[in-house]
UniProtKB/Swiss-Prot annotation:
<feature type="binding site">
    <location>
        <position position="290"/>
    </location>
    <ligand>
        <name>Mg(2+) 2</name>
    </ligand>
</feature>
<keyword id="KW-0464">Manganese</keyword>
<keyword id="KW-0436">Ligase</keyword>
<protein>
    <recommendedName>
        <fullName>D-alanine--D-alanine ligase</fullName>
        <ecNumber>6.3.2.4</ecNumber>
    </recommendedName>
</protein>
<dbReference type="GO" id="GO:0005524">
    <property type="term" value="F:ATP binding"/>
</dbReference>
<feature type="binding site">
    <location>
        <position position="275"/>
    </location>
    <ligand>
        <name>Mg(2+) 1</name>
    </ligand>
</feature>
<keyword id="KW-0547">Nucleotide-binding</keyword>
<dbReference type="GO" id="GO:0008360">
    <property type="term" value="P:regulation of cell shape"/>
</dbReference>
<keyword id="KW-0961">Cell wall biogenesis/degradation</keyword>
<dbReference type="InterPro" id="IPR005905">
    <property type="entry name" value="D_ala_D_ala"/>
</dbReference>
<dbReference type="GO" id="GO:0005737">
    <property type="term" value="C:cytoplasm"/>
</dbReference>
<feature type="binding site">
    <location>
        <position position="288"/>
    </location>
    <ligand>
        <name>Mg(2+) 1</name>
    </ligand>
</feature>
<keyword id="KW-0133">Cell shape</keyword>
<dbReference type="GO" id="GO:0071555">
    <property type="term" value="P:cell wall organization"/>
</dbReference>
<comment type="pathway">
    <text>Cell wall biogenesis; peptidoglycan biosynthesis.</text>
</comment>
<comment type="function">
    <text>Cell wall formation.</text>
</comment>
<dbReference type="InterPro" id="IPR011095">
    <property type="entry name" value="Dala_Dala_lig_C"/>
</dbReference>
Length: 324
């Protein structure tokens, strides 16, 4: 009998549009001969399943099921592709743990750590991972322009500490830009991270592990036409994404080894993607860890899967079957 798979998308942040795109990508990637697929949209208290006829029906949160006519359908597995809360920060994972439904990605702790950029960086720094200098501001806290310049320097990045897709991010070059950038970041999240700029080559590396194997994908080099890898660059084509990256085999191996180590340190599950900046002297610096990476047809992970000579359908099957 086919397993019923929920592709869980939506969320309560600006990234909802990106999440819904990823859901369509995942729907196209998963083997429909093996699984019954349904997209489940979550937004606030609205949890709905998309039916084949285009209509939507509510999800019963008691057991994560829905009624399809007179038939009750209970999901066997959740593929979480919510970028942002509640799917990337551990909240939804806690719900699925409580009702004992397996899911595609990291558990509560790893998701919560990686969703908080500042906490994740400080945690991994303790294991010897290189990170940039940064400051954290919480709602109600303030920092002077002088302190930013003295402690972090210019240029710097001011961004929401929670969230992704570069919403609310500003590359700050002058003192006059600091406070407006902080206000912009606070409009997206309750915490703001002020991070030192690092110039160099931007790379990203995907990885997943199962009970039987460990797979680290070829690296992608990210060359943006904009000031930085912002929303336009990510989703409107203002970037060159080169897979495999134009770097030495030795540096490739080092980045892949570090990615695998970060996966294990954090206790990850499913597919993750780790972003880096390579600075002078081939120093590998962590940017961030993504535990629910984008999965549209043109996203980094599908590109890397193709470059590795793998079939994305087989990768999706690995992720699902590893939980049974």
């Amino acid at each position: 009998m086919k397993r019923n798979i929920a592709i869980v998308a939506g969320g309560d942040t600006s990234e909802i549009v990106v999440s819904l795109r990823s859901a369509q990508g995942i729907y196209s990637f998963i083997d429909k001969e093996k699984y019954n697929l349904y997209i489940v949209e979550m937004e606030g208290r609205r949890w709905e399943v998309q039916l084949q006829d285009g209509s939507k029906t509510p999800v019963d949160r008691n057991d994560f099921s829905f009624m399809n006519g007179a038939e009750k359908v209970v999901f066997d597995f959740a593929y979480i592709t919510i970028h942002g809360t509640p799917g990337e920060d551990g909240r939804l994972q806690g719900y699925f743990d409580m009702i004992r439904i397996p899911y595609s990605c990291c558990g509560v702790l790893a998701a919560a750590i990686t969703y908080d950029k500042f906490v994740c960086n400080q945690y991994l720094k303790a294991f010897g991972v290189r990170i940039s200098e940064s400051l954290l501001l919480r709602q109600g806290q303030a920092v002077s322009d002088e302190d930013v310049v003295e402690k972090i320097g210019l240029p710097c990045f001011i961004k929401p500490n929670l969230g992704g897709s570069s919403f609310g991010v500003t590359k700050v070059k002058t003192r006059e830009q600091i406070q407006p950038a902080i206000a912009k970041a606070f409009s997206e999240a309750e915490e703001v991270m002020i991070e030192a700029f690092m110039g160099g080559t931007e790379l990203t590396c995907g990885c997943y592990k199962t009970k039987e194997k460990s797979v680290v994908f070829p690296l992608t080099e990210v060359v943006t036409h904009n000031e930085f890898f912002d929303y336009d660059a990510k989703y409107n084509g203002q970037v060159d994404e080169i897979t495999p990256a134009r770097i030495s085999e030795e540096l490739t191996r080092r980045v892949q080894t570090l990615t695998s180590a970060i996966y294990d340190i954090l206790g990850c599950s499913g597919i993750i993607r780790v972003d880096y900046i390579i600075t002078e002297g081939e120093k590998i610096n962590l940017l961030e860890v993504n535990t629910t990476p984008g999965m549209t047809a043109t996203s980094f992970i599908p590109q890397q899967v193709r470059a590795a000579g793998l079939d994305i359908k087989d990768v999706m099957t690995d992720i699902i079957e590893n939980k049974f």
